[in-house]
Amino acid sequence: MKTPGVLLLILGLLASSSFAIIRIPLRKFTSIRRTMTEVGGSVEDLILKGPITKYSMQSSPKTTEPVSELLKNYLDAQYYGDIGIGTPPQCFTVVFDTGSSNLWVPSIHCKILDIACWVHHKYNSDKSSTYVKNGTSFDIHYGSGSLSGYLSQDTVSVPCKSDQSKARGIKVEKQIFGEATKQPGIVFVAAKFDGILGMGYPHISVNNVLPVFDNLMQQKLVDKNIFSFYLNRDPEGQPGGELMLGGTDSKYYHGELSYLNVTRKAYWQVHMDQLEVGNELTLCKGGCEAIVDTGTSLLVGPVEEVKELQKAIGAVPLIQGEYMIPCEKVSSLPTVYLKLGGKNYELHPDKYILKVSQGGKTICLSGFMGMDIPPPSGPLWILGDVFIGSYYTVFDRDNNRVGFANAVVL
């Protein structure tokens, strides 16, 4: 018969053998759009130069459908975290983006005229003992040019842990990623992040590269194949939030999680029943498709419908696609209701109006933006951080579903 002490030891060993949740602190930064506006720059030329896509309109060999989503989202990305690539880890700040599926960072071999490369961390394969050459070229087309480079293989550490912090991390071995040697235009010069870590489905991965989270699942590095986001919407609040790999944390939400099935395994796409602006306006009549995208800070919809929405809340065009509302009117604006899975998700005006500094003054911007995504991928609504900040969000690959619960205010 085992003694109580031995039993406790066995239970302790069993408990330690299970995987804890991996926590990646997120920091909030000023978006590219706001940075360029502050210095008097313009992104309108970029926006007007044709289809501005996160990824090229190329097809996976498994499908004849082109897959695309818009780079315009990255102009408004606001949250990033740290990862490491190589052994020992070389640290990079990346946007954890559920609207794409590839990992890329700048390369030490970037072109001499690539200004964005100068001001960001660069991966150096010579400094990694786990680097394996791949060399396949990759090309991600944008409206003003293309982000290009070649693929490499190495170990990805999440989080980076080069600071010897005590936070538990994981190492994803043999991960294929992009070394970017050329970045387009001036857009990424203003970016506070080095690269992108896509967390969408493999279907939209350029060059059919296995996404980091899929590789992590294959290597059985987490107990549950889910990840979740808490975003701190306090403009002054740090940390900016937390990404959890392998689980959820109830301290970040109250009530129960409500789930929606993914309708297409490319982006994290779900069905939206409708969107209402107070009692004045109903959009997405008869239902529409929406993607849950951590890579954009805004709530985006078809141009004509969003024009109606902006009018209903009294927003007027400012510059660079932004709409402004007099700050003194914010408290009297209507509540916006997104109906998902038969349940209403409320966005009160203090949640969808963004207070930002411009020219030393505080102005109030609409958190909605119009953008048309053509068939076959579109039309789509994009539920960005304006929505995710109010609702703790769970991305469940085991059951191909997305969960929402009311986020707490820390």
Curated annotation (Swiss-Prot):
Molecular function GO labels: aspartic-type endopeptidase activity; aspartic-type peptidase activity; endopeptidase activity; hydrolase activity; peptidase activity
EC number: 3.4.23.5
Known catalytic reactions: Specificity similar to, but narrower than, that of pepsin A. Does not cleave the 4-Gln-|-His-5 bond in B chain of insulin
Catalytic-site annotation from UniProt: 97, 293
Cysteines engaged in disulfide bonds, as pairs: 91-160, 110-117, 284-288, 327-364
Propeptide: 21-64
Post-translational modification: N- and O-glycosylated. Undergoes proteolytic cleavage and activation by ADAM30.
Protein function: Acid protease active in intracellular protein breakdown. Plays a role in APP processing following cleavage and activation by ADAM30 which leads to APP degradation.
Name of the protein this chain belongs to: Cathepsin D
Source organism (scientific name): Mus musculus (Mouse)
Classification lineage: Eukaryota, Metazoa, Chordata, Craniata, Vertebrata
